[in-house]
């Protein structure tokens, strides 16, 4: 297939994600109904030209150029497919705030993959895009649900290949995500984790993950409450989130079934019945306010479609 023509434009929407969801460290993630929109255009210039236009003050620190995640993902698609690379412009309507534990980096990677694949005439199947996304990100729990939607478990098999399973999520269970004004980088959140963990902690997490998945499948409140329990990463990370433990306890007191750090944080995920959503949201915001941190806590639903190319036109 030939390279995209100058002026060709695609529009890609990519959902936010909440990863880990308590015990599913680096393997469990869910797409949520808050999305970034990327308008991607072939422009004149050599293949190393990449212009990034952010339509949000949240993204003012982000830059174009060859090190940009979006650009790197687009280049991987074209190299893999044998398509001549081209200069690009990406205009981003940013709804997913960076460095908050909602998969903002994953949206950039997925948008680069999906957008470049669309511009080139879809030479690569979605399975290949999944493989590339995991390789670029380094772990699957955000990029997989961001690409395909839903609640996803991703595991590496004994033959060193990735297997993805989409799991059921009962529609009566909603997610309240408290998003603070403070930031926390994934690299910082990973630095505090130990290199080795006790076997007993791993066993506890295996059991908790099983309970959580069954609870989400059936809507069983007790199973969800017992399953939202982690020993692998959260004990080391709560100390990085100002007021985080108080927000967690406030959410539970207001009716949340369980709470977890969303991804690497600092956002906090609470699972609850829809009827408890407003109470949980208000309680989390007030608890963070008491700690001197501004926040918002929208009630979210599972996003089932994943990333979508909603337009492919010539300018």
Swiss-Prot record:
It catalyses: L-homoserine + ATP = O-phospho-L-homoserine + ADP + H(+). Gene3D superfamilies: 3.30.230.10, GHMP kinase, C-terminal domain (3.30.70.890). Pathway: Amino-acid biosynthesis; L-threonine biosynthesis; L-threonine from L-aspartate: step 4/5. GO terms for biological process: threonine biosynthetic process. The keyword Cell cycle does not apply. It is found in: Cytoplasm. GO terms for molecular function: ATP binding; homoserine kinase activity. InterPro entries: GHMP_kinase_C_dom (IPR013750), GHMP_kinase_C_sf (IPR036554), GHMP_kinase_N_dom (IPR006204), GHMP_knse_ATP-bd_CS (IPR006203), Homoserine_kinase (IPR000870), Ribosomal_Su5_D2-typ_SF (IPR020568), Ribsml_uS5_D2-typ_fold_subgr (IPR014721). Keywords: Amino-acid biosynthesis, ATP-binding, Cytoplasm, Kinase, Nucleotide-binding, Threonine biosynthesis, Transferase. It is an enzyme of class 2 (transferase). One of its GO terms (cellular component) is cytoplasm. It comes from the Bacteria. PANTHER family: HOMOSERINE KINASE, HOMOSERINE/4-DIPHOSPHOCYTIDYL-2-C-METHYL-D-ERYTHRITOL KINASE. Catalyzes the ATP-dependent phosphorylation of L-homoserine to L-homoserine phosphate. This is Homoserine kinase.
């Amino acid at each position: 297939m030939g390279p995209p023509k100058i002026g060709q434009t695609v529009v890609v929407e990519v959902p936010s994600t909440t990863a880990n969801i308590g015990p599913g460290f680096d393997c469990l993630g869910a797409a949520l109904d808050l999305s970034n929109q990327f308008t991607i255009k072939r422009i004149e210039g050599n293949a190393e030209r990449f212009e990034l236009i952010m339509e949000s003050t949240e993204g003012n620190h982000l830059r174009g150029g060859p090190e940009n995640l979006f650009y790197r993902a687009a280049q991987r698609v074209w190299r893999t497919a044998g398509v001549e690379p081209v200069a690009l412009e990406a205009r981003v309507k940013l709804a997913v705030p960076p460095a908050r534990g909602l998969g903002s980096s994953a949206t950039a990677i997925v948008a680069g993959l999906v957008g470049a694949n669309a511009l080139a005439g879809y030479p690569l199947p979605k399975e290949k895009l999944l493989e590339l996304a995991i390789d670029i990100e380094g772990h699957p729990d955000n990029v997989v649900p961001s690409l395909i939607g839903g609640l996803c478990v991703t595991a590496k098999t004994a033959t060193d290949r990735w297997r993805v399973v989409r799991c059921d999520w009962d529609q009566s269970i909603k997610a309240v995500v408290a998003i603070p004004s403070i930031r926390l980088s994934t690299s910082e959140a990973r630095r505090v984790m130990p290199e080795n963990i006790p076997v007993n902690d791993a066993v506890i997490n295996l059991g908790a993950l099983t309970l959580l998945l069954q609870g989400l499948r059936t809507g069983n409140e007790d199973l969800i409450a017992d399953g939202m329990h982690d020993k692998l990463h959260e004990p080391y990370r709560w100390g990085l989130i100002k007021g985080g433990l108080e927000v967690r306890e406030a959410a539970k007191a207001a009716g949340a079934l369980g709470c977890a750090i969303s991804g690497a944080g600092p956002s906090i995920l609470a699972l609850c019945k829809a009827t408890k959503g407003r109470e949980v949201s208000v309680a989390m915001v007030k608890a963070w306010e008491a700690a001197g941190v501004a926040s918002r806590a929208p009630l979210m639903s599972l996003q089932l479609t994943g990333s979508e190319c909603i337009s492919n036109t010539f300018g």
